[in-house]
Amino acid sequence: MSTSTIAEKLGRSNAEIYRMILVLEQRGYIEKSEDIDGYQVTRRLLQLGTEHEPIKDILEYAQPIMRSLAEKTSMSCHIAVESQEQIVVISRVETPSNLSYSVRVGYRRPIAFAASGRILFVNQSAEKKESMINLLKKHHSEEEVKQFMADCKKVAKQGYLKAPSAFVHGVTDLSYPIIDSDHAVATLTIPYIMRIPEIMGIDDVLKELKGAAEEISKAVTYGIVRKL
């Protein structure tokens, strides 16, 4: 995001935003993006967020489960949470095999376009869903919101997401919710790629993913780790 865009969204002058960015960059919280004209958050800033005790507890508990999942499936996996109108990846485990596709920690994507976004949305209360829709309407066109809602209906029937990636050919997004009592607090996702020869079929990978997500969910619901 460029300085002028940030200034416009925050209702501040370019000079004010420039000074803020200068300080944040000097302290290592943001850096210039290599892919777009603007800035992105660094691991240091993300670390501050994940050091919040409940999140830290969940990630520490989830890490060995995610490692086991990656070893069994030979696929990378990641955990994502809601961040305003976006999802953000807060933890990732790579497969021990030589070939993999993974999503970096700190990766952000609009909820309306993300696999994790659909899973998070369908597993919320009616009140929370309404709040999320109102937020999405501020950032997306009416057609984009309608498409998101249509996609969510399909996901709600399945209870999980299995869909071709909207961003990378040959990748199938597999995602299950991490549930706290009756709503999703995060998602556990595998970007599935078919290898030659096939190590584990997609349906078997889904079963392993479901088991891992349920194990983490039980820890949150039953207080084994502190709640978000």
Indicate where each model-derived feature is located.
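N-terminal helix-turn-helix
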Residues: 1-53, 214-218
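Short hydrophobic alpha-helical segments used for membrane anchoring or interfacial signaling
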Residues: 79-84, 93
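Short, solvent-exposed recognition segments
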Residues: 99-167
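Extended hydrophobic
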Residues: 141-215
